[in-house]
Amino acid sequence: MNKKKIMSILVSAFLITNLSSNIIFADIKENVYINQYSEGNRSQPIAEKLVPRSEIQASATSALTGEGPEKAIDGNTSTLWHTPWAGVDIQINPQSLTLKLGKTRNISSICVTPRQEGTNGMITDYKIYSGDDVIAEGKWKSDSSDKYVVFDNPISTDNIRIEAISTVGDENNKHASIAEVEVYELADTPVKLAESNNKVINNGNGGNYEGDISEISLLEEGTAIIRFTNNGSSLFSISNNERTNEHFHVYINGGAIGYELRKQSGNLATGSVNKALNAGINTIAFKAEKGKGYSIYLNGEKILTSSSITANFLSTLEGLNTLSLGKTDRPSGSNEYNFTGEIDFFELYSKPLADRYLKERTGETTSKDLPFPEGAVKTEPVDIFTPGELGSNNFRIPALYTTKDGTVLASIDVRKGGGHDAPNNIDTGIKRSTDGGVTWDEGKIILDYPGASSAIDTSLLQDDETGRIFLIVTHFAEGYGFGNSKTGSGYVEIEGKRYLKLLGANDTIYTVREGVVYDSNGEATNYTVDNNNELYENGNRIGNVLLSNSPLKVMGTSFLSLIYSDDDGQTWSDPIDLNKEVKTDWMRFLGTGPGKGHQIKTGRYAGRLLFPVYLTNASGFQSSAVIYSDDNGATWNIGETATDGRLMDNGDRASAETITTNTSGGVGQLTECQVVEMPNGQLKMFMRNTGGNSGRVRIATSFDGGATWEDDVVRDENIKEPYCQLSVINYSQKIDGKDAIIFAIPDANYPNRVNGTVRVGLITENGSYENGEPRYDIEWRYNKVVAPGTYGYSCLSEMPNGEIGLFYEGRGSRQMSFTRMNIDYLKADLLQDVPAANIKSYTTNSENNIYDPGDKISLNVTFDQTVSLIGDRTITADIGGKEVLLTLANSKGGSEYTFEGTVPADISNGNYTITIKGKSGLKIVNVVNKVTDITEDRNTGLNVQVGEEVQSVDKTLLQDLVDSTSNLIKEDYTEESWILYEKALEVANKFLVNEIAVQEEVDAAKPTLENAYK
């Protein structure tokens, strides 16, 4: 049969997705260099292994002393190979790094890591050689991301040379540098051992794998990849369901993504990382490498690497008999970590797959930045404090404050002894911004106690009347911190006056009175103490009372220190110890609620300065309170705690002084806190808490400026509280016509500190208390995740222009980040205008688009973004009035799906348009959880030919002739002539009704009929 070739009307396309790293492919045959995603994820699963650095020898055309070629293979990206400072013209005299590989190897890819600090010598144009043969060339971006060169066909070679053709930096094309090179060689071909698709799982049900796992259970290494909609608990597992603790699983829990390899005897390997997930579909890969360790990849990024020379993956577990999706199959009564959600696909391979492939595959679900509506502002985060500044590699506990003059102050713990809390050498640092947080000065230390003494957890406040700025901080002597703080104020009261207590040998008590040290009998000694806590004997310095080796030293308890500035934060006073005024002897710990204080603006207590604090009693039970001043900070008092008066289960009222965890009767501990003001001057204290139905923010109310608190401490069910410091401020302007507060905290369950979220709360009056005071409720009208991923302590401040500044811990103790946003941004629903995936094109796999009845037909449906298809993975096509069921056969790149079916056997020949019938039961969801509507019929714009193409036939003249003979009279003709006429008429009518009659037949019938009746 002759078939005419008909081209499809629409052409398929692939979604281009960006990874955090710039990964470059090198097509050796065509010498073309393109981003790996611009070809639509062409890679196939590949296993490769790193050529051991110990087997590589590096040399270079030239090198700077101390930065030789060996630095490029030392496994440390902080070191580098660098050409001499004298420089050469690289474009005339190219510089190169040569790696001798020890033996001939099949090289599959190379990863080049540029220098991580600065740009000098960073290579852009490059060539890569094997011997004298160019095996790759191209151009790299001038940034610090890893650069991959991937060979479609492995290169058999014993050496690799990387040549710099052009570079950037202080003097373009004068220097060359490389931080690290990794060379990968081909490993054994991976085998897909298990696969499962299209699972809808409800509370762990619906994800059982029925295949044989005997080979899987022996794996010493391998790779698993899973695509799913965002939900919690176990994603997939391999377990012995007859033992409580004999399993491996990969899970998500709140904001944590992790894995657990566990035996009856205990954990063999675990790891987790806090990372933000897409609202819709996500892709995770887990890789186990024997003798090396374990890795996790999420949405195009390698997020976790755990090294282990004993890593043997599943082979270390006994009796493995189940593979499950959406749960960990364990004996009855055990926690199976049940998952509810949808799993697009799961694949398990016998080998550790290539790092670049896993970034590519998981990168199919990389989320693009959402567009901002007009008027919305959100700046990219900048790190205010970074490792190496102020003599420290670690910082924590950000505080932020905007002064009356518009200066923004950012204070921080400068943790010189490491990222941990006290005991530690911790100073107080500060930076200033005079342009609303756009730029910052170089910063300085403003409080530095001697040795490893600590100043931890700062809080800032300015007196609007005097302009004086106060900073309070918790202070410990060397060797002490929250955990080992001793009960007591650190002072001794004598005749109504309180004096600093010093302890000598055998804890003999001394006191400091106007700088002179008195013994326990009240007699003056030869010791004196100056304002810097230096200890003197007969005028000779012999120590410092804050140091552990001093003959006399302060009590090992917490102290509250206050410093102040009268010049907008440029200079600061010496510290003043507030324990003398505010700490009582039943308190074991008294410390700041880090962040900021508050000055009451309205009502009977207007002008009062207050700082949130929290404290513990002798048993360690925590309670929240405030210290306050009514004389512009000259003297300070401490109010009752929010614990005092709370109703316990036994009907008694709690006392912060005596309550214990054993006697608390359902009353949880209240800890770090912040305070805001209601329209009438009433205070609301927001508190971190633990025990007693914790997990949500607690709010206390004060009618007397913080001196006492309402007995009922409200649990706000709207705000998760993962036992992390929170920040809340009053906003100066009305929002939606109402007074408002701004609130920030990780939006996660304990113990995860992830997904930094800023909320807008509108203050609404709702009735009154029994004392007649108005009752205010907070309507949390808007919220936005502004810092996905790791997010710890934070502090908010309103910028001079009305924007909101947020200073937060972005990555442990090393990344102290700052961002600005406006109210329009916080109010905007960024997802509202993000479209669901659209079908971009339809194509068929036929070269000529002509089919016979009964032929197989394939329809490719390409979306404009990555999607998952969940549910009934079929579509129905209408071809020539016949319904054709098409079933999903395969997919490519997450955006192109191929459906296959059969052309109906009873369809007539002809040219037909393909229409896709509307349907339900198939969910097409993207990374932001938007679902594509396919309930309406869709014209694909594709035409297909069934059978031979039928040429158009003109039957008009023949029909006219037949019609003209209808009035003939038989008697006017001879019998023989009439018979001839009837036969000719029969033939003519036959061709008129015959749909496949050709023009030649029709044309021949006309003269035959004419001759018959004439």
Swiss-Prot record:
GO CC, sorted alphabetically, is: cytoplasm; extracellular region; intracellular membrane-bounded organelle; membrane
Q: What class of enzyme is it?
A: hydrolase
The record, for SUPFAM superfamilies, names:
Concanavalin A-like lectins/glucanases, Galactose-binding domain-like, Sialidases
Q: Could you tell me what this protein is called?
A: Sialidase
Q: What does this protein do?
A: Sialidases have been suggested to be pathogenic factors in microbial infections.
Molecular-function GO term, any one: exo-alpha-sialidase activity
Recorded catalytic activity of this chain's protein: Hydrolysis of alpha-(2->3)-, alpha-(2->6)-, alpha-(2->8)- glycosidic linkages of terminal sialic acid residues in oligosaccharides, glycoproteins, glycolipids, colominic acid and synthetic substrates
Which EC number(s) are documented for this chain? 3.2.1.18
Every F5/8 type C domain range: 39-186
Q: Name one Pfam family in it.
A: FIVAR
Q: Which organism is it from?
A: Clostridium septicum
- Subcellular compartments: Secreted
Instruction: Note whether rRNA-binding occurs among the keywords.
Output: no
Q: How far does the signal peptide extend, from start to end residue?
A: 1-26
Decide whether keyword 4Fe-4S is in the record. Answer: no
Q: What is the lineage of its organism?
A: Bacteria, Bacillati, Bacillota, Clostridia, Eubacteriales
What's the main place this protein lives? secreted
Catalytic residues in the record: D421, Y912
The record's Gene Ontology biological-process terms are: ganglioside catabolic process; oligosaccharide catabolic process
Protein family (similarity comment): Belongs to the glycosyl hydrolase 33 family.
- The residues that the entry says bind substrate are R396, R688, R873
